[in-house]
Amino acid sequence: MKALPALPLMLMLLSMPPPCAPQASGIRGDALEKSCLQQPLDCDDIYAQGYQEDGVYLIYPYGPSVPVPVFCDMTTEGGKWTVFQKRFNGSVSFFRGWSDYKLGFGRADGEYWLGLQNLHLLTLKQKYELRVDLEDFENNTAYAKYIDFSISPNAISAEEDGYTLYVAGFEDGGAGDSLSYHSGQKFSTFDRDQDLFVQNCAALSSGAFWFRSCHFANLNGFYLGGSHLSYANGINWAQWKGFYYSLKRTEMKIRRA
């Protein structure tokens, strides 16, 4: 099957029909009308409205006039998960600049990044937990959970604050804790270096993340297909597979705590 082109999420919205039109591409038809009427904030709201199948729905973190497509995981551990990062085949490049990571890119029915501003707005309005699901090329799976997740919750301007990550309350699902190291860090891309290292971690790691000096997690790195010779520039989760193994599938998702 031919891969879908990767578009910034905001550009994709501009090309979509009106949000309540049944032909809106990629949105579950049975859920579309009700989600537009209720204007859900996240997948928790959609689940509460009775729509409990995995798929793409519309949420409204900006308010009633700006729908945002998102993938909802309605089955894992009771469902209600709003997926903000999804990778599974390398069809979308994640080596991108600040603007793309701020606004989002890809398609919610494929590989995508929801956008830092969307994440900030969600965590500004509700308390969330984070789950990170991982799979390797031998079909082994593991996850990590954090009972507290937020993005620049106290900032006047989240962007000026660097969309700082806060996580706490690690719970191990076999993956180990590779994210607590990044808590308190600003987000960095190759064109906006906000890490603590003397060099540009995003450029060195071929990705974008809440780098410190540099990382134990690099889930937006190159899709390298398993073991690789280059150091720490694949889809790495160091506490599970180290710095020389690029994962097959990742999902980062949040649910109300």
UniProtKB/Swiss-Prot annotation:
Coiled coil: none annotated. It comes from the Eukaryota. This is Microfibril-associated glycoprotein 4. Homodimer. Can also form higher oligomers. Interacts with FBN1, FBN2 and LOX. Interacts with COL1A1 in a Ca (2+)-dependent manner. Interacts with ELN in a Ca (2+)-dependent manner; this interaction promotes ELN self-assembly. SMART domains: FBG. It is found in: Secreted, Extracellular space, Extracellular matrix. A motif (Cell attachment site) lies at residues 28-30. Residues 1-22 form the signal peptide. The keyword S-adenosyl-L-methionine does not apply. Glycans are attached at N89, N139. GO terms for biological process: cell adhesion; cellular response to UV-B; elastic fiber assembly; regulation of collagen metabolic process; UV protection.
